[in-house]
């Protein structure tokens, strides 16, 4: 608790400095950070290797080790991502609305930082930089608590970040890492209302549920991704195959990867064998309902939990449905309100799908893998929010702000 109090106090103080920082000053600091990450590549890789070795000794699946791994190319991508945030418009100080009321008061609504943001996350070291940069750009101080499996990588990254920001004239406490990775400290952080204005969990279902059940700090939920691809009877065959393979296999360990294929009965016998062949190239394990299993050559029988699970692996659940309505009902029952896709050339069916499916992102004839800040064109995101307050979908710069009313008068009093 001592570490939390010390760093919470420092973050609160730093947030006041950051709220007054100019866009020019913040951007200059971020450009320096982008360069410093490249300069320290060798050290970052050396520290990351400690985490990788520990994960292998534990028998961690390769798909999860991939989330943990830093490479020279990935550090270049992280550095480039920092530059992309520099290029984005700073929302702080933006006047979103202005009007005069009956009392001749001029009322303006402007964007301001949230204050101090707490982020609890799991394996991916790139989150340490992404989260730090987004919070910093929007004038927020941030306290990060990563998983124990990435502690050496995170400490090394935090050292680079803090040294770089300090050299640019910002407090080291603008961005901080909780180095105690115990559950007790995480629980204490969830109740740090004295210093934290909001808490954002990024990780698996268990982590997110733990935060939701225990936090007294306001939480923005970044939900798990049990994403579906529905192949309609009016779907183009090759398009459906290409989208399915991309959504499932391009990076199965991320939250916007597809976990379940729903396919209309009218095209199942024709499309499923070709899909199985394409997926076999990636050694995808298929878990199918009775009708799909009767068509596929190699598939295990799906269980109830297979419709609910976020596999984060080369595993795909498959179900044959009688109609688009059945697919929609299945998605709304088992989905996590993240990203859902329909493949169909029927306009009315596509419209019905996007209107009825409850998700942060709904795709028509495209892969779910585009639910990402960079892919959508607004830079790195702090996470994918699956709730409806305070933000929904990929959370970029604007979603890390609040609003303040500024009222100008010339002596008005209220009768």
From Swiss-Prot:
BP terms from Gene Ontology: L-proline biosynthetic process
EC number: 1.2.1.41
Domain of life the protein comes from: Bacteria
PROSITE patterns: PROA (PS01223)
Molecular function per GO: glutamate-5-semialdehyde dehydrogenase activity; NADP binding
Compartmental location: Cytoplasm
Primary role: Catalyzes the NADPH-dependent reduction of L-glutamate 5-phosphate into L-glutamate 5-semialdehyde and phosphate. The product spontaneously undergoes cyclization to form 1-pyrroline-5-carboxylate.
Catalyzed chemical reaction(s): L-glutamate 5-semialdehyde + phosphate + NADP(+) = L-glutamyl 5-phosphate + NADPH + H(+)
The protein's annotated pathway: Amino-acid biosynthesis; L-proline biosynthesis; L-glutamate 5-semialdehyde from L-glutamate: step 2/2
Keywords, comma-separated and alphabetical: Amino-acid biosynthesis, Cytoplasm, NADP, Oxidoreductase, Proline biosynthesis
Organism: Listeria monocytogenes serotype 4b (strain CLIP80459)
Family: Belongs to the gamma-glutamyl phosphate reductase family.
Record Pfam families: Aldedh
Classification via SUPFAM superfamilies: ALDH-like
Alphabetized CDD domains for the sequence: ALDH_F18-19_ProA-GPR
Protein name in UniProt: Gamma-glutamyl phosphate reductase
Taxonomic lineage of the native organism: Bacteria, Bacillati, Bacillota, Bacilli, Bacillales
Cellular component annotations (GO), alphabetically ordered: cytoplasm
Enzyme class: oxidoreductase
